[in-house]
Structures are given as C-alpha cells and as structure tokens.
Regions:
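N-terminal Rossmann-like NAD(P)+-binding subdomain of aldehyde/semialdehyde dehydrogenases
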Residues: 1-136, 183, 321, 338
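Short, well-ordered beta-strand elements within core beta-sheets of diverse protein domains
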Residues: 18, 31-37, 53-57, 131-132, ...
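ALDH superfamily catalytic-core signature
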Residues: 200-201, 225-227, 235-390, 412-414, ...
Length: 689
C-alpha cells in the first residue's frame, strides 16, 4: 500500500486530513492514498524562489546541462523499477516505454542542447548586434536571463513520467526551480521517479518540490516572476488561466490542452496502396496506444468520399485483432483506462458524439484477458461515422478521451482542409499521401490551426515517429482549443523560462555585459601573438592586426589549378566583365579566406589545438589582382569545455575575422572556432548541498 508523501521545503511531508485513494486500473483495488492537506503553498513558492532559484542561477547553462545528463543516466539505470508501477495505471510495456524512457530521453535531449546551443554562461545572448547609430557608437543586443520565480507544473494523468520530465528539463536548464503537481491518478509512478531524482543528489536544495494531492490554493500565491505550465482538459486550463492572481500579476501561463486532432487520408491513398495501409495502421495505433488516452491521439479520421466503407472495414478488422486486458499478460495490446471515472466520462462523451454519428464498430460486449472487466477500468475501441461533418459539430466539439474515433468524408481537398480546421485548434494533425501537391495544399491550408503536422508516406514510414509522439526538438502545443501554448521545441522550450531583455549602449559596454566582443568595442593589442596564449590568458577583445599581402594574377591561376575551380569570373577577363557584377577577373573567395589564414596563423606548436569550424562567412567586396589585403583577428567569445578524465583541458574560442583591402574596406567577414588548451580543468557541476 502506497502512502504517498509530498516533498515540500526540503522534506517529505505526509498530508493531514482526508486522503484520496489510489486505485489499480486493472483490478479496481485500492493501492494507496495521499493527501496534500496541511501544506503551506505560499511557503513552498517562497522556498523555491529564495533557496532553489539562487543556487540554480549560480550554475552556467553547461553546468545545468551536465546535471540533467547525470540525472538521466541514473534514472535509466533504475528504469525497470518503474515498469511494474506503470502497469498499475493500465499501461502496456510499449505504453510505459513511451512514458518512462521517452520522459528520461527529454533530459538527455536537453542536456545535449544545453551544451551545444547555449554558451557556458548564466545568461544567453540572442541574435546579432543591432546597429542603432550612424557612426557605430550606439548599438543594441538581446539577452535572456532566468526568471527569478518558481515554475509550477500541473500535469495530466495519462503520462505520469513524461509529463513531469518534459517540463522539468527545459525549466531546470533555464535555472528555474520547480513545483510538480501531478494528477493524483497515477501519482504513485510520478512519486517513484521524483524520489529517484532526489536520490541522485544532483539537484540543489529547493530545486524540486512535489504535491501529490490537491493543489487547492497554490495559484493564489504566484507572482510576476513565476511561471505556470498546465497540461489537461481545455475547460480546467481555461479556468486556471483566468485565476485572479494569474491575471493580476501577468504570470506566464503555458497551456497544453486536449484537442480534436485529425488524420487525413489523401485522395491518392486508395485501398491497395502502401499509404492506405499506413493510414489504417496509424489510426489503430492512436486509438489503442494508452487506450486512446493521449492528448495527441487521432479523434477525427477525414477520408475521401467513397472510401468510407473500405476504411471502416479495414479499421474494424485491425481493431478486432487487438487483445484487451491486463497489460502484464503476454499478448495484451491494450490495457484499461486510468480509472472508473474515465470509463464513465468516455462513455458519456461517445454517446454525445453519437447524436451526429453512427456507431459502426464496438459498443457491445468484449473480452478481457487476465482481468475482471467489471472491476477494472476497461473500455473497448469504438468507431463512429458522421455522414455530414460540415453541418454536425459534435465530432468537432466533443472529445471522448479514450479509444473513440469518428470517420468523416470529404469531397475535395478544400473540404478536407475545412474539416481539419473545424477542430478550432489542435496539437497535431497528420496527412497520409504520396502526392507532394496534395501535401502542399493540405498542410499550408490547415497549418495555422495546428501546432505540429505530420506527412506520412511509404518513404518516411519506416523511421517515422508517428502521429502521436511529441519530440523534445520540435514544439508541442497548439492554437485555440489546444491551449495556445508551446512546450519543448529544443532551445525554444528553455526560453519560456527566461526573460528577454533588449540592451542598448556603446559597443564596449555591451561587450562587458555579454562577454562577447561587439564590433566597435575596445580592442587590446600586445606583442604576443594570440595563438601563443592559453585559453585562460586570452581575453575577449584581444586583437591581432596582420601584415599585408598583395594578391596577384599568378595567385588566382595557381589556386584555380590546385582547387579545380575554374569558374569563368576567375579565368576570363572579358566574361567576368560581361556579367555586370565584376570589373574583371576576380580572386576566388576561398582563396581570400585561405590567404587570410596565412596572414594570421602562428604555425608553431602552441596552445591552439585545432580549427574546427568557420561560420557566417560573407564576401562583401570583390578582390582583384593587385589588391592588397590584411586581417583584423579579434577574440569574440570564449566557452570553457567540460574536461573528462584523461583528456586535455580546453575551451572553444570564437574569433571575429575581418579581411580588409587597401581602401580600408572589408572584403570578407566571418567567425572561426578553435580549440585552445586551458591551464586547468573546468570544474564539474557543483553538487547539491
């Protein structure tokens, strides 16, 4: 029997007063209880802001990313502990894999992105420098800094692990402490994974808190620096979003709500094609995976008029082979709903849809393997058919959050798009077609009503992640009924927990704040070549002005012969003049870059270990034989790298390169990246206190 405690103010706390029962979805038996009565929600928010926040913000993005990675590794080592707990929610092994290992995967994904897409700083510089004055003495730049409040995460019952981890990953990477409020249904699984995270001792005090029971007055205490992220029904989300405290303090509220997602069968995908079979397989999977309890599940199947009978027959056959029962029994492909309350809710919603649709599959007795159908929360798949979906709104307005799907016909692509849009905003829509013209018309016609759209055909099917799978590197959310919010999406998900600030000032001031050299800022020159300096000795703004080199016609011809690039503008004076761009034969741009390297590189063995990249290259003016060039090389940014045991301590130095001609005009501008030896290893992520 689980006695679920809450985790508040750095301690496990058992709720007082009446408790809520936790029930096994398969057997109907009580498996535990929990309560949040007695918790001081205001104190929990203050603890997160005053204890967890300052410590998390003292870490750099890279340190927080490594923290996530170590937590993810630890959770993967313990993953098998969570599968039996997941089966109690009605999830099959496959369902649980998506929830458990998919959730842990978001931590791995954000750990990787945190080190690749953010610098090793406590803030993030966004976008290019914006010139704001004629002479360059006044410029602008955007930076992102962590919000100094707490993130309140209110999660749904259908994914107890993924629902928690997909919100925690970007928030913790941003440096914001979190209070997790899972649905009480299934909270025994959330509780176990949460405790496993604490067992790693990777997170600092105050970084995480957990409420297993009701949240009651929690949102009454949020303030302007807090963030609320909600996943659940549209009705509940809209009610919470309108809370007086949310409105009064303009609290960021990200809402991801269940929606009437659709899948469209293209007119080319007739029976006998691979695409028709893919459509049948995808709709069936979305109806039976998690017993249809997914916010991304297909609720509306939009098919060409005339193919309804074929689609109904194929879906009925495939659904008929789906074994329902105890998910721990071998061969069972679909488990029960999460609770008896869900059974009543789904049945009621399906009945309401049937006011506009005919039941064409399901609805009668069904067999259950390894369990008692009356005691468990079982509900068999149902297929409905709406013959007039343009005038009957029930299938577009009512969601049965379970294995229920409504088939509806369209006469042309314009009508298919119209039906897709009638969901009034969806998390995801899919189109099954092998015709690029169909894909273009449908996707561009329906895109503004969707957060994500999948085009599925024979080419992508083998590797496709499917209609219902949100991915950490793509946005998850949708307009309108879907909540109007957005989660994940790679670095975008992190920015929801950061404040964007527009900076204005002189280039030197902006450089001092961002620690990234801005053109026009002060430069430092000395007698030591910058390639002779270690990473630690180099300073942002260190600059080398090279000697000059005059480019000759022999240089151009030699480079053409060596590279094989004999483009006419380099080799024929008359042809070069004829194109209206050049005044005559012009040097290869890549020769200019190579010649520039010859001017600024120090060739001897030293701290520079390797050149591993060139970015943002632009050729701003032609270089003709007889022109003389030199280079201004400036340290633009430094990023210390983590130093695994046995490797050379190093960091990445980004250099601003400007190649200049004899008229003091830039002819090429770009950045190069070098690995430079450090004097000492980078400290590992600070350990939790």
């Amino acid at each position: 029997m689980f006695q679920l405690q809450n985790y508040a103010l750095g301690e496990w706390v058992e709720g007082t007063g009446p408790k809520t029962d936790l029930v096994h979805a398969v057997t109907g038996e009580k498996i535990g209880e929990t309560s949040s009565h007695g918790l001081d929600f205001k104190a929990m928010l203050q603890y997160a802001r005053r204890v967890g926040g300052p410590t998390l913000r003292s870490y750099t993005f890279h340190q927080r990313a490594l923290m996530l990675k170590r937590v993810a590794i630890a959770l993967m080592e313990r993953k098998e502990e969570f599968y039996p707990l997941s089966s109690m929610t009605g999830a099959t092994r496959t369902d649980s894999w998506v929830d458990i290992e998919g959730g842990i995967g978001t931590f791995f994904a954000y750990a990787s992105r945190g080190r690749r897409e953010f610098t090793n700083e406590r803030f993030h510089v966004e976008g290019p420098t914006e010139p704001l004055s004629k002479h360059g003495t006044f410029v602008g730049r955007h930076i992102l800094v962590p919000m100094e409040g707490a993130a309140v995460h209110i999660n749904a019952f259908n994914f107890p692990v993924w629902g928690m981890l997909e919100k925690l990953a970007p928030a913790l990477l941003a440096g914001v402490p979190c209070i997790v409020k899972p649905s009480t249904t299934g909270s025994h699984l959330t509780h176990a994974v949460f405790k496993a995270i604490l067992d790693t001792h990777e997170l600092p005090k105050g970084a995480l808190q957990l409420i297993c029971g009701e949240a009651r007055t929690l949102l009454e205490h949020v303030e302007e620096q807090d963030i609320v992220a909600f996943t659940g029904s549209a009705a509940t989300g809209q009610k919470l979003k309108a809370a007086p405290s949310i409105m009064a303090h303009s609290v960021r509220f990200n809402m991801e709500a269940d929606s009437l997602n659709c899948s469209i069968l293209g007119p080319d995908a007739v029976p006998g094609t691979e695409e028709f079979d893919l459509f049948i397989k995808e709709v069936t999977r979305e109806m039976t995976s998690k017993a249809g309890q997914k916010c991304t599940a297909i609720r509306r199947s939009i098919v060409p008029a005339g193919l309804e009978e074929a689609v109904i027959a194929a879906l009925s056959k495939r659904l008929g082979s789906t074994t329902i029962g105890d998910p721990t029994v071998e061969g069972v492909r679909m488990g029960p709903l999460a609770s008896r309350g869900q059974v009543k809710s789904v049945a009621s919603s399906a009945e309401a849809i049937r006011a506009a649709a005919e039941l064409v599959y399901g609805g009668g007795d069904f067999a259950v393997v390894g369990a008692d159908r009356e005691k468990g929360s079982f509900f068999a798949p149902e297929l409905l058919y709406c013959a007039d979906p343009l005038t009957r709104l029930e299938p577009h307005d009512i969601e049965a959050f379970g294995p229920v799907n409504t088939i509806m016909p369209y006469r042309d692509l314009g009508e298919a798009v119209q039906l897709a849009r009638m969901g009034r905003g969806s998390l995801v829509g899919s189109l099954v077609t092998h015709d690029p013209k169909v894909a273009q018309e449908v996707i561009l016609g329906a895109a503004c009503y969707h957060g994500r759209m999948l085009v599925l055909d024979r080419t992508s099917a083998k590797e496709s992640t499917g209609h219902g799978s949100p991915l950490p590197n793509l946005v998850h959310g949708g307009p309108g009924r879907a909540g109007g919010g957005e989660e994940m999406g790679g670095a975008r998900g992190v920015t929801h927990y950061l404040q964007r600030v527009a900076l204005q000032g002189s280039p030197s001031m902006i450089t001092a704040i961002t620690r990234e050299w801005t053109k026009g800022a002060e430069e430092t020159q000395d007698s030591v070549h910058p390639f002779r300096k270690t990473f630690d000795a180099l300073q942002v703004g260190d600059t080398l002005i090279t000697k000059s080199r005059t480019i000759t016609l022999d240089d151009v011809e030699a480079f053409a012969k060596l590279s094989g690039d004999t483009f006419y503008a380099h080799m024929n004076d008359e042809d070069a003049r004829s194109n209206g761009v050049f005044e005559g034969r012009v040097a290869h741009g890549y020769f200019v870059v190579s010649a520039a390297a010859g001017l600024f590189v120090d060739p001897d063995l030293g701290p520079v270990l390797a050149n591993y990249g060139l970015e943002k290259l632009r050729f701003t003016k032609p270089v003709y034989p007889g022109d003389t060039i030199h280079v201004r090389l400036t340290v633009k940014q430094k990023t210390a790298k983590d130093t695994p045991e046995g490797t050379i301590p190093q960091g990445v130095v980004e250099w601003d390169v400007e190649v200049i001609n004899q008229h003091d005009e830039p002819v090429a501008v770009y950045s190069i990246l070098t690995l430079v030896r450090r004097g000492e290893a980078v400290p590992v992520t600070p350990q939790a206190a």
